[in-house]
Amino acid sequence: MRLIIVSGRSGSGKSTALDVLEDSGFYCIDNLPAGLLPQLAENALINTELLQPKVAVSIDARNLPSHLMRFPELLEEARARHIQCDVLYLDADEEVLLKRFSETRRRHPLTNANRSLAEAIRVESDLLGPIADLADLKIDTTNLNLYQLRDSIKLRLLNQPEPGTAFLVESFGFKRGMPVDADLVFDVRCLPNPYWKPELREHSGLDQPVIDYLAAQPDVEDMYNDISSYLLKWLPRFAASNRAYVTIAIGCTGGHHRSVYITERLGRQLQQTLKNVQVRHRDL
């Protein structure tokens, strides 16, 4: 049996995550009391005909604070039943969460007469801290629309053809912010920028004219070789430490040229030596 626990601050996309999982064949339970996690795992093993082999539950700040504080031991009890448990934690910048609530006019579950929306979001962050600390996978939804979030969940959580650590090599642009869910970040803004070549500006790092330009730059080759050597040496150590997910982020200014080119090359090389390597371009 596989159990996916979905959590995160309100407005970060938990409902969307559950919808994706349900569409993928998971039996989904919204707002499960955290204290029932061990019982859910136990009942799933005893009554296999009652539950599907894939179950997803959401746990949020509407739980009793005492149950949320006990989440580490509750998760350990569930895993002691020899069930594969993955914790997915969704989050976004506070300003983005405020904007989402303003646009939808929904009420935050922790607001009241004495607590503003901004205060409720900060309180929620504290309450969910024990879950966030144990997340196997964190997804920052700040810059993701509904469709991008759905694709990200499918790519990172469901598209694992073989067991073991899932590696994601992701390009991004610093002008839209660093991905907060990245484990390793490499800044390639010091490399020659095709943006300043008028004939290359409208192309991306996936297009042959940009590829040819960057491949001819000695600094680009040196940077690629240094990053590649580091990753080839150390990523197997991450896998050996039983990490479920590792995200490698490559950033340039806009996320269209240099980071895309480097990310594509790294992805192809890592796929030759590691299992479960995926490539994503956040800002294309």
Curated annotation (Swiss-Prot):
The residues the record assigns to binding ATP are G8, R9, S10, G11, S12, G13, K14, S15
Keywords recorded for this protein, A-Z: ATP-binding, GTP-binding, Nucleotide-binding
Pfam families, per database record: PapZ_C (PF22740), RapZ-like_N (PF03668)
Q: List the disulfide bonds.
A: none
Q: What residue range is the signal peptide? A: none
Q: Where does GTP bind?
A: D60, A61, R62, N63
Q: Care to name a GO molecular-function term for this sequence?
A: GTP binding
Question: What superkingdom heads the lineage?
Answer: Bacteria
HAMAP family according to UniProt: RapZ_like
Regarding protein family, the annotation reads: Belongs to the RapZ-like family.
Q: What does this protein do?
A: Displays ATPase and GTPase activities.
Stored PANTHER family: RNASE ADAPTER PROTEIN RAPZ
The name this protein carries in UniProt is Nucleotide-binding protein PP_0949
